[in-house]
């Protein structure tokens, strides 16, 4: 069997935590930021965990992580 390739775009977007969960950056913080309040932008800043329904898909993208 050949080795499974890692999806490089996913490798740049997701990081695995010590407990085996995946962290990701939140959306809506790239452009058109002048309309958004400072509070909204501050709440979007921290990384959040990938939802339970998407974990299996992320794991298939990152077989060696």
Curated annotation (Swiss-Prot):
| Disordered as annotated region, ranges | 1-22
Question: Where are the compositionally biased (Basic residues) regions?
Answer: 10-22
Q: Which GO terms describe its biological process?
A: translation
* Statement: the UniProt record of this protein carries the keyword GTP-binding: no
The UniProt keyword set, sorted, is: Ribonucleoprotein, Ribosomal protein
What domain of life does the UniProt record list for this protein's source? Bacteria
Query: Where is it found, in Gene Ontology cellular component terms?
Result: cytosolic large ribosomal subunit
In the record, what terms sit under GO molecular function? structural constituent of ribosome
**InterPro entries the UniProt entry points to:** Ribosomal_bL35, Ribosomal_bL35-like, Ribosomal_bL35_CS, Ribosomal_bL35_sf
PANTHER family in the record: 54S RIBOSOMAL PROTEIN BL35M, LARGE RIBOSOMAL SUBUNIT PROTEIN BL35M
Q: What protein family does this chain belong to? A: Belongs to the bacterial ribosomal protein bL35 family.
Question: Record's NCBIfam families?
Answer: rpmI_bact (TIGR00001)
Query: What is the protein name given in its UniProt record?
Result: Large ribosomal subunit protein bL35
Origin species: Buchnera aphidicola subsp. Schizaphis graminum (strain Sg)
């Amino acid at each position: 069997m050949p080795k499974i390739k890692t999806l490089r775009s996913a490798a740049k977007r997701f990081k695995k935590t010590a407990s085996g969960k995946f962290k990701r950056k939140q959306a809506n913080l790239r452009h058109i930021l002048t309309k958004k309040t400072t509070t909204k932008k501050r709440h979007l800043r921290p990384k959040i965990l990938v939802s339970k329904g998407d974990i299996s898909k992320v794991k298939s993208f990152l077989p060696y992580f």
